[in-house]
Amino acid sequence: MIYNQKIIVVLPAYNASKTLEQTYNEIPFDIVDDVVLVDDNSLDNTSEVANSLGIKHIIKHDENKGYGGNQKTCYNKALELNADIVIMLHPDYQYTPKLIHSMSYTIANGLYDVVIASRILGKGALKGGMPLYKYIANRFLTLTQNMLMNQKLSEYHTGYRAFSKKV
């Protein structure tokens, strides 16, 4: 919690049993109040690993709803738990949880209502296991979108986001 604002990290999971523990253990619980994991009908033991880590809010989809459906479940549960700040963190460790402090304080201090982080800077995506073809495709799409929209973002399609409940 920062300035009496409840912070919830949501983990949209699919076959994340091998990387979930590493991701979870780096979440800064000095400010994070709760964690929600939504298992999108994984074929591995993602839910069991989440349970063994002590994650209190585990939702398992009976059928795979895809990334968008998983996100909706994550955000709806966080709002149901009265989150003031919701941070989406993928449990595949392509995003470092170490940015949660900065993202949270940026919103808690009222600077922005939305913070979008990048896994591309510093080659974090490749170090985190992103396949090279996906990395190249992501870079190409981002370059194209930057040119079309006259922007300078490092990654348009990031899944590492923080939102104020206002948005």
Region roles according to the model:
Residues 61-63, 67-80, 97-167:
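Acceptor/aglycone-binding surface of glycosyltransferases and processive sugar-polymer synthases
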Residues 16-19, 42, 96:
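Donor nucleotide-sugar binding loop of glycosyltransferases
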Residues 39-47:
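A conserved acidic beta->alpha catalytic loop
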Residues 13, 38-40, 61:
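Conserved sequence signature across two-component system core domains
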Residues 6-8:
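Cell-envelope/extracellular polymer assembly enzymes that use nucleotide-activated donors
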Residues 41, 66, 94:
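A short, conserved beta-strand element in the Rossmann-like catalytic core
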Residues 83-94:
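Short beta-strand-to-loop acidic/aromatic patch adjacent to the donor-nucleotide binding site
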Residues 14-29:
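Short, well-formed alpha-helical segments that are part of the catalytic scaffolds
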